[in-house]
């Protein structure tokens, strides 16, 4: 049954509905453009902070690297410290969420460990600048952001410890935690150290080597100390 004139007015005619659709599409485009600009600023921040250090990078530097003016950065972040916080919080959440997905894909602990190692290697080779920023500029975060990053990363470490405990049920959790941290050190430091010596690392060749070394360290049986 056709709608009455009153109902049509209430619901909006074809022209009104078309206008609403256009406004919604424009709003979506603006949101997408804003998010792309935000991501560009974070990418620029990772590169500049890694190269020069947090304290030597200005908002004008960040804006110029992302193609905007310094004051325009405030449309996306409260300030430079907020950029650093967003950068390290985002990557910490990505690590934890990615690790949880990896572990959920299999019930076999060795397969889960292999996937965790591959996941960490991909991260290290893909985002060496972020790792450098974390190591050098963590203290420049606000206390609130420091606490949240620590919590996220602690949960990520414990995810590894839980998988390792299934492979080494008789090994103390503290030792398993040490293995996990040592493995992160091995994996995370290699891309930056090779690049800093003037040689560009090829993920294609470095990835399998790092994965093999990490798995060997994680799966080795602990040697007993001599009496």
Language-model features, listed with the residues they occupy:
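Amphipathic alpha-helical packing segments from all-alpha helical-bundle domains
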Residues: 93-96, 143-168, 177-181, 205-208
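Helical hydrophobic small-molecule/effector-binding pocket
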Residues: 113-135, 184
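N-terminal intrinsically disordered/low-complexity leader segments
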Residues: 1-36, 196, 222-227
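Hydrophobic alpha-helical segments that form the core
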Residues: 1-6, 23-26, 173-194, 205-217
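Helix-turn-helix
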Residues: 36-40, 44-82
């Amino acid at each position: 049954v056709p709608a009455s004139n009153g109902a049509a007015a209430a619901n909006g005619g074809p022209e009104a509905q078309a206008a609403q659709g256009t406004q919604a599409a424009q709003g979506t485009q603006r949101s997408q453009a804003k998010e792309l600009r935000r991501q560009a600023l974070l990418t620029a921040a990772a590169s500049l902070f890694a190269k020069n250090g947090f304290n030597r990078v200005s908002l004008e530097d960040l804006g110029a690297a992302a193609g905007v003016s310094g004051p325009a950065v405030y449309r996306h972040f409260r300030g430079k410290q907020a950029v650093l916080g967003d950068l390290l919080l985002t990557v910490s959440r990505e690590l934890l969420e990615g690790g949880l997905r990896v572990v959920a894909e299999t019930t076999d602990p060795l397969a889960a460990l292999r996937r965790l190692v591959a996941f960490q290697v991909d991260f290290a080779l893909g985002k060496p600048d972020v790792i450098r920023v974390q190591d050098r500029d963590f203290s420049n975060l606000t206390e609130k952001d420091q606490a949240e990053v620590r919590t996220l990363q602690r949960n990520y470490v414990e995810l590894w410890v839980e998988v390792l405990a299934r492979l080494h049920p008789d090994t103390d959790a503290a030792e398993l935690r040490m293995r996990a941290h040592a493995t992160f050190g091995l994996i995370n430091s290699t891309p930056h150290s090779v690049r800093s010596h003037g040689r560009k690392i090829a993920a294609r060749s470095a990835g399998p080597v790092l994965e093999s070394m990490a798995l060997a360290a994680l799966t080795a049986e602990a040697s007993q100390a001599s009496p």
